[in-house]
Regions:
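Bacterial N-terminal signal peptides
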Residues: 1-7
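Boundary at the C-terminal end of the N-terminal hydrophobic targeting segment
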Residues: 9-13
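Outer-membrane beta-barrel transmembrane domain signature
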Residues: 16-22, 27, 32-34, 39-44, ...
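N-terminal carbohydrate-binding/catalytic regions of secreted carbohydrate-active enzymes
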Residues: 61-62
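Glycine/small-residue-rich loop that forms an oxyanion/phosphate-binding "nest" at active or ligand-binding sites
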Residues: 72-96
Length: 206
């Protein structure tokens, strides 16, 4: 699959915010690594690692088991932001996808933050270069509230082809904890609609 969450790290993988704030000196790299474990009913569980690196306005990313299982992708994007109290951050991207699914993918990361609230989203459309019917729009969206710096809770929605349930859009709740440069988020999808899917996400930033 995909997280951003945050998880939402610059790549909105599960467990992090959609965009890494640019608080470092311009010459420094901002790095993040996230590992999300998917516990899906009636199928084999799997892990999805993602990595991102940002320098100044440029964003680089790599993902595995994200757009699809046994599939990798690499990304190049450009970061920008606007606002102060109401902060908007976005990264338009272009990616190459290879493996079980192969194609080209324009995508984006975006977040809107105000006080203790954050709305974050990421999406991509994979143009399957081997089979047109395999083209797919992926989306991950979170809305969260952080009463204190180290805790957040909220809602999440996901559309993916990395795993399947009886629902086209997976929906659920999230609870996240963070300490310094480490964060851990639990996502529970589809409780009350079908057998729940759980995602456990551990992220590091450097």
């Amino acid at each position: 699959m995909a997280v951003l969450l945050g998880g939402p790290s610059l790549a909105q993988t599960p467990g992090g915010s959609a965009i890494e704030s640019d608080s470092r000196p311009p010459a420094d790299w901002a790095l993040s690594f996230n590992l999300a474990g998917y516990v899906v009913p009636n199928t084999q569980s799997y892990a999805s690692p993602t990595f991102s690196a940002d320098k100044r306005k440029f964003h680089f990313g790599a993902r595995y088991n994200y757009e699809d299982q046994h599939t990798g992708s690499v990304w190049l994007g450009y970061n920008f932001e606007a606002g102060d109290k109401l902060l908007f951050q976005a990264t338009p991207m272009i990616g190459g996808v290879f493996g079980r699914t192969t194609g080209i993918a324009p995508g984006y990361l975006a977040s809107l933050s105000w006080k203790k609230l954050e709305l974050s989203s990421e999406g991509e459309f994979v143009f399957d270069t081997e089979e047109r019917s395999g083209s797919f729009f992926y989306s991950w969206m979170e809305f969260s509230y952080s009463p204190v710096e180290w805790f957040r809770a909220g809602l999440v929605a996901d559309r993916t082809k990395a795993y399947k349930t009886s629902l086209d859009i997976q929906r659920g709740v999230l609870i996240g904890l963070s300490h310094r440069r480490v964060d851990f988020t639990t996502y529970i999808f589809n409780a009350g609609w079908t057998t729940p899917t759980m995602v456990l996400s551990l992220g590091f930033s450097f």
